[in-house]
């Protein structure tokens, strides 16, 4: 079996300019990776690349993008016939903030994130947090309001439909890096901030609970997912973390594991997810180098029965 394309000296970070114009050198999927999978349809989104998150409902598909090689904004497709997706609208957003995550809360409410790009941090017209849309007309969402949070805003919101709570990786004054923000979504038109969770060492005045030489400034939450009354979190270079949200207003840290520190595995923990009805978790890493030049990261499975 041939190995994927690999560059021993990958380009990492540097912002969007590092990605523009780079020749794509990735391999195609291996045959065994496409077992029992059939391509039904494809849309080039009119050249709007860099698709990040997709939500489908009511016969429409909402695709959020963040423009490195594409556009900042959202594409709406009619997918009533899944084999023939048709673009029905494209909404361009300001490049001042990333709005690359979209959530379809119900038939009427659509939410995107708003994460301010560092170079626009002092722009008074840029708001970080959540953006609320009236989606009564599913082809023409209408912006209603911002739900503002501190700092650069919110990176990745996840909606817990069973508990009507939203778990976001976002910023909070007095804390370093992104922390877990909890919003009450009983009124989806007006999300209410009710709780905050963090890793010891993120709050001002606390000592790091991680190895600073290995983790560096990578101790921050990327994503929080519901698992009953718990939230499972990919915590970037500091591994995976679980919080007890029996009281969502007072998230309690339970434990952290980080093979990046203990076993030299890759960092960039993206997602820690227990599928609904399962007793096993899936943990993924994110590739953070141009052209995915870094050696492939892992997909790990955890037994969550205890």
List the predicted regions and their residue ranges.
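Feature marking well-ordered beta-strand scaffolds used for ligand recognition
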Residues: 1-306
């Amino acid at each position: 079996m041939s190995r994927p394309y690999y560059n021993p000296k990958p380009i990492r970070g540097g912002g969007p300019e590092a990605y523009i114009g780079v020749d794509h050198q990735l391999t195609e999927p291996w045959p065994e990776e496409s077992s029992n999978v059939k391509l039904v349809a494809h849309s080039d989104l009119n050249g709007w690349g860099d698709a990040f998150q997709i939500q489908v409902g009511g016969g429409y598909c909402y695709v959020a993008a963040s423009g490195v090689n594409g556009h900042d904004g959202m594409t709406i497709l009619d997918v009533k016939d899944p084999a023939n997706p048709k673009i029905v609208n494209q909404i361009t957003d300001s490049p001042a903030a990333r709005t690359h995550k979209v959530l379809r809360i119900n038939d009427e409410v659509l939410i995107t994130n708003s994460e301010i790009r560092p170079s626009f941090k002092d722009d008074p017209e840029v708001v970080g947090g959540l953006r609320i849309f009236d989606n009564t007309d599913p082809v023409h969402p209408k912006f209603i309001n911002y739900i503002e949070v501190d700092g650069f805003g919110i990176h990745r919101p996840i909606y817990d439909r069973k508990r009507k709570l939203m778990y976001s990786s976002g910023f909070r004054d007095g804390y370093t890096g992104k922390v877990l923000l909890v919003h009450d979504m009983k009124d989806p038109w007006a999300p209410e901030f009710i709780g905050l969770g963090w890793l010891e060492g993120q709050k001002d005045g606390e000592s790091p609970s991680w190895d600073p030489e290995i983790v560096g400034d990578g101790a921050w939450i990327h994503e929080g997912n519901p698992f009953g009354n718990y939230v499972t979190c990919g915590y970037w270079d500091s591994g995976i973390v679980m919080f007890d949200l029996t009281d969502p207003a007072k998230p309690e840290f339970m434990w952290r594991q980080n093979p990046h520190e203990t076993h030299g595995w890759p960092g960039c923990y993206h997602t820690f997810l227990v599928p609904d009805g399962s007793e096993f978790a899936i943990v993924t890493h994110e590739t953070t180098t141009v052209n995915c030049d870094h050696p492939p990261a892992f997909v790990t499975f955890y037994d969550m029965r205890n």
